[in-house]
Amino acid sequence: MNTQHDEAFHAILEAKYARIINEISEMYSVSLEEAMDIFYNSPLLPLLEEGVADLHCRSDKYLAEEIWREQVE
């Protein structure tokens, strides 16, 4: 990948992360800070960053639900 493509991909991912965090906060009535902690400590985050199974293509709501489910198990 070229640098310009990398920067664009990371900007898109960062926006997606913000939406997922917001979804977690709204769906499960936790503060944004708690939602951020849950998100950034999720085992799913490295998979999203690496593009495993095109997880970044899944809906924000789906990913929020999966991250929450992992956290409560």
Describe the residue ranges of each PLM region.
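C-terminal alpha-helical interaction appendages
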Residues: 1-73
